[in-house]
A protein has these predicted regions:
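Conserved donor-binding/catalytic core segment of Leloir-type glycosyltransferases
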Residues: 4, 218-234, 240-243, 258, ...
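Glycosyltransferase donor-sugar binding loop
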Residues: 45-46, 199, 227, 256-272, ...
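A short helix/loop element that forms part of the nucleotide-sugar donor recognition site in Leloir-type
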Residues: 51-68, 204-217
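Nucleotide-sugar donor phosphate/pyrophosphate-binding loop at the beta->alpha transition
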Residues: 134, 144-167
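Carbohydrate-associated surface elements
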Residues: 177, 198
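Aromatic "clamp/platform" in nucleotide-sugar-dependent glycosyltransferases that forms part
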Residues: 310
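Short hydrophobic beta-strand element within catalytic cores of glycosyltransferases
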Residues: 327-330
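Conserved acidic donor-binding segment of nucleotide-sugar-dependent glycosyltransferases
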Residues: 342, 346-353, 361-367
Length: 413
């Protein structure tokens, strides 16, 4: 099959969190099965990132220019980065999308659009409808507007989103929670398909202690980790309040809290002020965003990972923490909660008392903690990408006509 993935953000722009990681995992998994997979995305500053490389280096790394923008080839997947004429947060305006669709869209059997609050996906969906090309929409947790520009997002749903979903052959949800949200908002239940996310562990793990050493965190300290965008939706402020309710020490162990992730709308400054007011500044560290080995080192060196979100369609970071063998605490509003519960950690209400009680229970009960460490391996074994990739392959096949003899399955620009 010839598959086009459309996403506002994609590797190497990992600062946008989970979506680039998810799209790449699915794309590479399908390419390994022999499908022609292309990714259409926005350019968030490749010129700056690649300027130190020579032309020969760029070619060796799989980079070159296409008629539409930068092009990258990696493990059988070709990605096109459309120039961005305007950028605001994770939204861009990419006029070249119209030209791309006119020239290339007819080459694909199916289109998969990730995310809903952007112009790129909407433009491709409109073009796909006009060509009777089936397309799949995956909201990636954006469907319910929780924070930031809520009324604007509701207007988008009314004027744009309804058409996007109405024209979709299938809408992907990654948890039972997201299925309920979509159905309650009027998306036809027979159109919704549940497909969980996966987790991809590193081939080799960073040396234990590397992350703590980088931040001068003592080996004997009990380390609580939050890793993700410092966004109101993810409730880092609730975690800080919960941490402030905990004792400074449990037994011989000092408790420390690390926030690892990009700032969002000055949230870090508000957290810093709150930590000072609570008298815990000396035990709260902001590491900034972490990627690659640094991210996995943080998971591995932590004692507990916390995802206290107001709403989370799945919760990839909790799955990653479990893959590193670190027990987790997640709120009931996280899609991954049913998989985590009493296997790899605790599921709690979205309030500071519940989070604080769960953390103290985990850190004071070595037997329970050891059970959850073992459970992390069990959860990870259930979260490989193989099943989600197989599910998407079957879904796409049901949406597309039989292949025409002689048509290339090679990725296209």
């Amino acid at each position: 099959m010839r598959i086009l993935n459309v996403t506002e953000t994609y590797a190497p722009f990992l600062e946008f969190g989970g979506p680039p990681v998810k799209v790449r995992a699915l794309a590479h998994g399908l390419a390994r099965r022999g499908h022609a997979v292309n990714v259409l995305t926005a350019d968030w500053g490749l010129e700056k990132r690649l300027r130190h490389h020579s032309e020969s280096d760029l070619q060796a790394l799989g980079w070159d220019r296409s008629p539409f923008g930068w092009r990258h080839a990696e493990e059988g997947v070709q990605s096109i980065y459309l120039p961005s004429w305007f950028r605001y947060r994770a939204l861009s305006w990419n006029p070249a999308v119209k030209r791309y669709c006119r020239a290339r869209l007819q080459n694909f059997d199916v289109v998969h659009i990730f995310g809903i609050y952007d112009l790129l996906g909407y433009a491709v969906a409109a073009s796909a409808r006009s060509r009777n090309t089936p397309y799949v929409v995956e909201p990636i947790g954006m469907f319910v507007p929780i924070v930031r520009n809520v009324w604007l997002k509701r207007m988008y749903h009314h004027f744009v989103g309804q058409r996007l979903f109405a024209g979709a052959s299938t809408v992907i949800a990654t948890s039972d929670l997201e299925v309920q949200e979509l159905a309650s908002a009027g998306v036809a239940l027979q159109k919704i398909v549940l497909r969980r996310n996966g987790v991809e562990s590193p081939g080799s793990w960073p040396v234990r202690g590397k992350f703590r050493a980088s931040l001068d965190i003592p080996e004997q300290a009990k380390l609580i980790l939050f890793l993700g965008r410092l966004s109101p939706k993810k409730s880092p402020d609730l975690l800080l309040q919960a941490f402030g309710n905990l004792p400074e020490r449990i037994g011989e162990h000092t408790l420390m809290l690390v926030f690892a992730g990009p700032d969002d709308n000055s949230m870090q400054q508000r957290l810093t002020t709150s930590a000072s007011r609570l008298g815990i500044s000396g035990r709260v560290i902001f590491s900034g965003p972490l990627y690659g080995d640094d991210k996995w080192a943080a998971y591995r060196d932590s004692d507990v990972f916390v995802l206290p979100s107001q709403n989370e369609n799945f919760g990839n970071t909790a799955a990653e923490a479990a893959a590193a063998g670190t027990p987790v605490v997640v709120t009931e509003q996280c899609g991954i909660a049913p998989l985590v519960k009493d296997v790899a950690g605790l599921v709690v209400a979205h309030d500071e008392t519940s989070v604080a009680n769960a953390l103290e229970r985990l850190l004071r009960d070595p037997q329970l903690y050891a059970e959850f460490v073992s459970g992390c391996a069990e959860l990870t074994s259930r979260l490989s990408w193989e099943k989600p990739v197989s599910q998407m392959e079957e879904l796409y096949a049901n949406l597309t006509p039989p292949p025409v003899s002689g048509v290339s399955s090679r990725p296209m620009e």
